[in-house]
């Protein structure tokens, strides 16, 4: 499988991160929106930077608080999506990560969310963009990949799929057999992260204590075995939120990350 890493996983400017990621031998890079917004390069310049380093942009993320918004906020959610699609076209990437809604004003309902994703899929299709939906472990209504998959299944759109993140699944001890039943073609990308065992708020645990696969206590190998049973052969991408990584030597951390995916 090809390997990728999110820019949020290491420190430095966007240029420095891209350089370190390429030197470590990754095939692709997830562009984290904050890294994009805080750099002084245009989208087309970022596109050139990535390609000049022999990488491809595996996805653009995150897009928050999209699905299930009340009517008076729904149009704005779609307008925000369209603006992100415009940026993605300039970056030359075709996958956006939409994480499950955490807004207090969002509404529940599998069918409501599925309808939102079908409509967004139609807009994305016009631009040859794919929409990947990820269940955050702390999402207001959707906090389990099984529910995210049900939304994707009901949306029934070729441009809408699921994004699996090992932390969100394993931190909640969700039955891994539920992964094996997802069609490989509907898994748009897989993000990997391990973590030490902690009894703490899921959001805080995720934002500060993730680490490389094999360096924590989560059953990553079991997750990978379940993934293998789907026949998935797309990107494996690291998404590591860790305070020490964000202040440590980026080139070494990038190399360690690459090693964790191929060992």
Question: Can you describe what each PLM-predicted range is?
Answer:
Residues 27-28, 56, 94, 130, ...:
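Residue-level detector of anion-binding/catalytic polar loops
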Residues 38-57, 129, 213:
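Short acidic, glycine/proline-enriched helix-loop-strand junctions
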Residues 7-15, 31-43, 65-75, 103-108, ...:
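Acidic-and-aromatic substrate-binding clefts and catalytic sites of carbohydrate-active enzymes
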Residues 42-53, 116-124, 178, 222-226:
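Catalytic-core regions built around general acid/base machinery
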Residues 24-33, 59-65, 100:
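Short, conserved active-site loops that position catalytic residues or coordinate cofactors/metal ions
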Residues 15, 52, 67-162:
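Active-site acidic/histidine proton-transfer and metal-coordination neighborhood
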Residues 1-4, 11-24, 51, 92, ...:
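Histidine-acidic metal/acid-base catalytic patches
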Residues 30, 59-61, 97, 132, ...:
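Conserved beta-strand positions in the central sheet of alpha/beta enzyme cores
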């Amino acid at each position: 499988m090809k390997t990728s890493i999110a820019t949020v996983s290491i420190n430095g400017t966007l240029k420095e991160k891209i350089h370190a990621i390429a030197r470590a031998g990754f095939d692709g890079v997830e562009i984290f929106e904050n890294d994009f917004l805080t750099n002084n390069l245009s989208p087309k310049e970022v596109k050139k930077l990535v390609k000049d380093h022999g990488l491809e942009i595996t996805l653009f993320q995150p897009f928050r608080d999209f699905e299930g918004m009340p009517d008076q906020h729904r149009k704005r959610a779609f307008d925000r999506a369209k603006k992100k699609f415009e940026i993605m076209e300039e970056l030359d990437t075709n996958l956006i990560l939409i994480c499950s809604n955490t807004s207090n004003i969002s509404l529940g309902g599998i069918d409501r969310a599925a309808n939102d994703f079908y409509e967004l899929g139609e807009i994305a299709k016009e631009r040859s963009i794919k929409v990947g939906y990820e269940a955050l472990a702390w999402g207001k209504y959707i906090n389990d990949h099984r529910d995210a998959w049900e939304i994707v299944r009901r949306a029934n759109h070729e441009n809408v799929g699921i994004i699996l993140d090992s932390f969100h699944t394993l931190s909640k001890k969700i039955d891994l057999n539920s992964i094996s039943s997802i069609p490989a073609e509907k898994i748009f990308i897989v993000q990997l992260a391990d973590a030490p065992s902690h009894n703490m708020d899921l959001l805080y645990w995720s934002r500060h204590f993730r680490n490389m696969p094999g360096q924590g206590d989560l059953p990553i190998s079991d997750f990978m075995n379940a993934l293998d049973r789907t026949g998935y052969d797309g990107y494996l991408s690291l998404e590591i939120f860790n305070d020490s990584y964000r202040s440590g030597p980026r080139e070494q951390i990038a190399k360690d990350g690459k090693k964790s995916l191929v060992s």
